[in-house]
Amino acid sequence: MQTIKCVVVGDGAVGKTCLLISYTTNKFPSEYVPTVFDNYAVTVMIGGEPYTLGLFDTAGQEDYDRLRPLSYPQTDVFLVCFSVVSPSSFENVKEKWVPEITHHCQKTPFLLVGTQIDLRDEQSTLEKLAKNKQKPITLEQGEKLAKELKAVKYVECSALTQKGLKNVFDEAILAALEPPEPTKKRKCKFL
């Protein structure tokens, strides 16, 4: 059975672990526990063939900047996550996360993933953002950044409601299985 390695990166507390737990167990975790490194595996059928989707969760906190890239070799696709209600996590996609993964894995495809879309219209969240003269990140802003950074696609989801959740992983699988351009190897390699 072929394995697809999918590594999830992004700032701390944007919902990476919730995304993975909600997708793999259909349950939303009740408490926040910062991740150091975790992985999950699910079997998916694609065109009648079984694949193992290996999901690697990483720590977004700066303390783990040197440890995190150890999970990058052999990655088939990255999910670069930000919270649609955290403009700083959106900024860090461009400032930190895409530069980091492209430094280590130049040719590996990645999706830009907007998380926590259930909070986009929540009154208390909007008020908190307004105090700092901020607004939630829009679908259009996500799509624009994805194009600018050459992501395969921009997708959004809520791990809480599961809206768009399956689509995130379907798109990740498609990105990993896309036939590579003949001259390029697309798996992440460390030299």
Curated annotation (Swiss-Prot):
It is found in: Cell junction, Adherens junction; Cell membrane. It is a lipid-anchor. InterPro entries: Cdc42, P-loop_NTPase, Small_GTP-bd, Small_GTPase, Small_GTPase_Rho. Residues 189-191 form a propeptide. CDD domains: Cdc42. GTP binds at residues 10-17, 57-61, 115-118. A lipid is attached at C188 (S-geranylgeranyl cysteine). The modification Cysteine methyl ester is found at C188. One of its GO terms (molecular function) is GTP binding. GO terms for cellular component: adherens junction; cytoplasm; plasma membrane. GO terms for biological process: ameboidal-type cell migration; anatomical structure morphogenesis; cellular process involved in reproduction in multicellular organism; developmental process involved in reproduction; hemocyte migration; maintenance of protein location; melanization defense response; positive regulation of cellular component organization. SUPFAM superfamilies: P-loop containing nucleoside triphosphate hydrolases. Keywords: Cell junction, Cell membrane, Developmental protein, GTP-binding, Lipoprotein, Membrane, Methylation, Nucleotide-binding, Prenylation. A motif (Effector region) lies at residues 32-40. Regulates mbt kinase activity and is also required to recruit mbt to adherens junctions. Together with mbt, regulates photoreceptor cell morphogenesis. Belongs to the small GTPase superfamily. Rho family. CDC42 subfamily. This is Cdc42 homolog.
